[in-house]
């Protein structure tokens, strides 16, 4: 599959139309490792056979050179790269930027030819040093958030010079060319301010359109995170806030459909309703909903946290006009995607000949299979099946996708039993890890009063001094 990314023109288009060239791009966030308990996620949790491309988010920048951000990025890079040993067709990319990164470092870097050359040279060295197959630009956004208007053109220049440098380096070394992709805006004003679409499309291998965050608690009323279509009562600029409009805007303004990758969110936005009895789309809200126990961000729940909300008695509803679900309980309300909406969107993707799907993020899907009772990675597996990627030959038999465990890692690991084992142990106990009296390799994981029995990896025991798995 991955070799198809090097094809251009008619051959690529024909393959895409035959359904054999769809890409399934999955982002991994390097801060997911810090989530507590069952939410902690590292590259070892990734099923290497799940996605065609994995993107490590994020790298940083200093003095116009690419840099690491987290203290253990280099170690995580190695684990990320090891996934290719299980799937020889897998491509791994490194994303630079992100929302929290801001725009100032990009603006300073693109401002002069010398700075751009410094950056690109550092990128080539960095990607090869750590085994990446390409770079993903995540500048949010050119021409916006303090980025001057000239950055719209300079972003095109940067991408062009990056692509040309990658091509030249490939010729000189006789190695495969490094890929260059970008995560781009779905909001019309940001698109118009930031991207020269026809020119940019010439140089990018793929364009990852962030078709999510269309609505959230910042608006003062309920709305879906990633609706496929507009809501019947939408007027004015709200009619643009949907997947259909955003993707067609990119396509109609010069981006080839086969290069356009539709964004799929493995999360939702939650709200506090002003009136519990007024709980539909567009209902007045008083702010962001409570933070989830794992992602710990107000107004934001991972898919697995939403499943816990549903299990806790929330009412799930389906919005036929936008082909997405929402759920509510009391004054809490969340708009999100599930396996049904992913399947419908994937069908729409194929009918419109787009290049594939991008998921933010792999660590937000129910990767343990604990919360949703739909197996592991239910959302991404839905896309994999819908895009016809199930038959890809890949051996992940020895790959762990359970919660992390290593000496000093508080999240624990190993095979998790159902919550019925040790039922009642966590009643009245604070969230945390506790020893199992008759088994040094096992421990109880208490999460919101629910009891989970887990095991450390072979050779490790539960250490009460650090409440972690440690060497015996």
Swiss-Prot record:
One of its GO terms (molecular function) is endochitinase activity. Glycans are attached at residues 395, 409, 415. The keyword Glycoprotein applies. Its main location: cytoplasm. PROSITE patterns: CHIT_BIND_II, GH18_1, GH18_2. Disulfide bonds join 26-51, 49-394, 307-372, 456-469. Residues 423-472 form the Chitin-binding type-2 domain. Its EC number is 3.2.1.14. This is Acidic mammalian chitinase. The gene is CHIA.
């Amino acid at each position: 599959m991955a070799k198809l990314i090097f094809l251009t023109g008619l051959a690529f288009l024909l393959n895409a139309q035959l359904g054999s060239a769809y890409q399934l791009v999955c982002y991994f966030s390097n801060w997911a490792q810090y989530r507590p308990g069952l939410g902690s996620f590292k590259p070892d949790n990734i099923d290497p056979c799940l996605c065609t491309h994995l993107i490590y988010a994020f790298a940083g920048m200093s003095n116009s050179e690419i840099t690491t951000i987290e203290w253990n990025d280099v170690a995580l890079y190695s684990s990320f790269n090891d996934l290719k040993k299980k799937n020889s067709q897998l491509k791994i990319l490194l994303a630079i930027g992100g929302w929290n990164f801001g725009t100032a470092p990009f603006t300073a870097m693109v401002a002069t030819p010398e700075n751009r050359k410094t950056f690109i040279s550092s990128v080539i060295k960095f990607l090869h040093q750590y085994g990446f197959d390409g770079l993903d630009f995540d500048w949010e956004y050119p021409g916006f958030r303090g980025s001057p208007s000239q950055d719209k053109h300079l972003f095109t220049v940067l991408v062009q010079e990056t692509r040309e440098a990658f091509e030249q380096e490939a010729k000189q070394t006789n190695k495969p060319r490094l890929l260059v992709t970008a995560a781009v805006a779905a909001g019309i004003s940001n698109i118009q301010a930031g991207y020269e679409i026809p020119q940019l499309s010439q140089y990018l291998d793929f364009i990852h359109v962030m078709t999510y965050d269309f609505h959230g608690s910042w608006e003062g009323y309920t709305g879906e995170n990633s609706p496929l279509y507009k809501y019947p009562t939408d007027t004015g600029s709200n009619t643009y806030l949907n997947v259909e409009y955003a993707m067609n805007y990119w396509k109609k303004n010069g981006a080839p459909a086969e290069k356009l990758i539709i964004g799929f969110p493995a999360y939702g936005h939650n709200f506090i309703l002003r009136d519990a009895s007024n709980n539909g789309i567009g209902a007045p809200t008083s702010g962001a909903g409570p933070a989830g126990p794992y992602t710990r961000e107000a107004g934001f729940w991972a898919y697995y946290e939403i499943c816990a909300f549903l299990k806790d008695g929330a009412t799930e509803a389906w919005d036929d006009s936008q082909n997405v679900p929402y759920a509510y309980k009391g004054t809490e309300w969340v708009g999100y995607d599930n396996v049904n909406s992913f399947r419908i969107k994937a069908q729409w993707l194929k009918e419109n000949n787009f290049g594939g799907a991008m998921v933010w993020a792999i660590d937000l899907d129910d990767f343990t299979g604990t919360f949703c009772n739909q197996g592991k990675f239910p959302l991404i597996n839905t896309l994999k099946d819908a895009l016809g990627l199930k038959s890809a030959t890949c051996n992940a038999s020895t790959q762990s996708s359970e919660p992390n465990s290593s000496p000093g890692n508080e999240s624990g690991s190993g095979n998790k039993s159902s919550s019925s084992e040790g039922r009642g142990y966590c009643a009245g106990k604070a969230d945390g890890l506790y020893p199992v009296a008759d088994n040094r390799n096992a421990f109880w994981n208490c999460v919101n009063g629910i009891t989970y029995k887990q095991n450390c990896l072979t050779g490790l025991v539960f250490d009460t001094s650090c409440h972690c798995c440690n060497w015996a």
